[in-house]
Amino acid sequence: MSDVAVMILAGGQGERLSILSRQRAKPAVPFGGKYRIIDFALSNCVNSGLYDVAVLTQYRPHSLNEHIGHGRPWDLDRERNGGVVILQPYLGRSTSGWYRGTADAVYHNLFYITRRPYRDVLILAGDHVYAMDYRPMIAQHRERCADVTIAVQPVDWREASRFGVVIVAEDGWVVDFEEKPERPRSNLASMGIYLFRRNLLLDLFTRDHPDAPEFIDFGRDVIPYLIRTARVATYRFDGYWQDVGTVQSYWEANMALLEDEPKLNLYDPNWRIHTRSEERPPAKILEGATVIRSLLSNGCIVEGATVIRSILSPGVIVKAGAVVRDSIVMTDSVIGPGAVVDRCIIDKHVTIGANAYLGWGDDNSPNWLEPSRLNTGITLVGRNAVVPPGVRIGRNVLIGPEVKESDFPGAVVPSGETVNPIATVVWS
């Protein structure tokens, strides 16, 4: 579809993911062992025949830029007939500073959709995990002669307040939109996927609209205004879609991949999820090892250890006698001999010392520093951290990036505590 331009919003910080997104943009967070979250939006584009793709970055873009590069893994390294471009905030005569919101990001990059005579512009969130063919949505949008079409999915009523929700009339047109309401009137959640007529989008941002708010955010400003002034439709998507914006939802979405028939099938030959992969040897499981219901990426070595219901990214080494259970361990981390890692998320290049125990005990006290993010028993270990041998670390513990052995004040880290190299913490 050469008449559709795609803009992927990938500049979000994702604060609710705690230290997982402290040193990288949320779309660059690893997922499912070998992938990153942005891989799903990019793969959906090329699998849908959409090759004109712009990725709008902002917060800590280095790892995301490095991952996407020229777009070769997604067949987006094209000089003609499409290709991927990465657009970052820039200083110019009429623009300054960072993007203030999703709509502001698109406004500052309108030049991208004027390069060719596109008919429509597809705007995607780059921080969701899903497998979606965009072609039926585009077809419905054009058949209904809609100005804007919003992809929606029903969610549990108890979760609806986490999303922007739409209210639809009997004739199928949207009559109201509420951004993360305390008392939602609908459970039809916006997926952060918007399909605009290009000319309407250009008119919206380049002409005066005296009765309009300042267009900073699509959910808060643009969509409510267009509901009053344009034809806004919905496209209901019933396939797999997950907002992995919290530590718990991120962990659950990864663990769901281990089911016999997961809703997100990474093995579907008709809908491949592409990624940038390093050249690494196959995973190796040595004598005496036990691996049950787990995903092991290339370069992993399990040396007579036990891995249960866990996901290991490339290059992870689990030493003899160690146990990894219900956990996510990212690239090139080493689990020392005899160590136990239970219900943890371990970032890249972490070293867990021999006989250390992470996820120790039954105390589920929330983390004192981030109680709203770490309260379900998951312990987080930041990138490049070194955990000393023999230490006991409870649940809902936050081990910051770059922590060294000398940053640990004792042999026991109680549940709900934090170890951070920036501050000295004294526990009673």
From Swiss-Prot:
<protein>
    <recommendedName>
        <fullName>Glucose-1-phosphate adenylyltransferase</fullName>
        <ecNumber>2.7.7.27</ecNumber>
    </recommendedName>
</protein>
<keyword id="KW-0321">Glycogen metabolism</keyword>
<feature type="binding site">
    <location>
        <begin position="179"/>
        <end position="180"/>
    </location>
    <ligand>
        <name>alpha-D-glucose 1-phosphate</name>
    </ligand>
</feature>
<keyword id="KW-0547">Nucleotide-binding</keyword>
<dbReference type="InterPro" id="IPR029044">
    <property type="entry name" value="Nucleotide-diphossugar_trans"/>
</dbReference>
<keyword id="KW-0808">Transferase</keyword>
<comment type="function">
    <text>Involved in the biosynthesis of ADP-glucose, a building block required for the elongation reactions to produce glycogen. Catalyzes the reaction between ATP and alpha-D-glucose 1-phosphate (G1P) to produce pyrophosphate and ADP-Glc.</text>
</comment>
<feature type="binding site">
    <location>
        <position position="99"/>
    </location>
    <ligand>
        <name>alpha-D-glucose 1-phosphate</name>
    </ligand>
</feature>
<dbReference type="GO" id="GO:0005524">
    <property type="term" value="F:ATP binding"/>
</dbReference>
<dbReference type="InterPro" id="IPR005835">
    <property type="entry name" value="NTP_transferase_dom"/>
</dbReference>
<dbReference type="Pfam" id="PF24894">
    <property type="entry name" value="Hexapep_GlmU"/>
</dbReference>
<feature type="binding site">
    <location>
        <position position="190"/>
    </location>
    <ligand>
        <name>alpha-D-glucose 1-phosphate</name>
    </ligand>
</feature>
<keyword id="KW-0067">ATP-binding</keyword>
<comment type="pathway">
    <text>Glycan biosynthesis; glycogen biosynthesis.</text>
</comment>
<keyword id="KW-0119">Carbohydrate metabolism</keyword>
<dbReference type="GO" id="GO:0008878">
    <property type="term" value="F:glucose-1-phosphate adenylyltransferase activity"/>
</dbReference>
<comment type="subunit">
    <text>Homotetramer.</text>
</comment>
<keyword id="KW-0548">Nucleotidyltransferase</keyword>
<dbReference type="GO" id="GO:0005978">
    <property type="term" value="P:glycogen biosynthetic process"/>
</dbReference>
<dbReference type="InterPro" id="IPR005836">
    <property type="entry name" value="ADP_Glu_pyroP_CS"/>
</dbReference>
<comment type="similarity">
    <text>Belongs to the bacterial/plant glucose-1-phosphate adenylyltransferase family.</text>
</comment>
<dbReference type="InterPro" id="IPR011004">
    <property type="entry name" value="Trimer_LpxA-like_sf"/>
</dbReference>
<feature type="binding site">
    <location>
        <position position="164"/>
    </location>
    <ligand>
        <name>alpha-D-glucose 1-phosphate</name>
    </ligand>
</feature>
<dbReference type="InterPro" id="IPR011831">
    <property type="entry name" value="ADP-Glc_PPase"/>
</dbReference>
<dbReference type="Pfam" id="PF00483">
    <property type="entry name" value="NTP_transferase"/>
</dbReference>
<dbReference type="InterPro" id="IPR056818">
    <property type="entry name" value="GlmU/GlgC-like_hexapep"/>
</dbReference>
<dbReference type="InterPro" id="IPR023049">
    <property type="entry name" value="GlgC_bac"/>
</dbReference>
<keyword id="KW-0320">Glycogen biosynthesis</keyword>
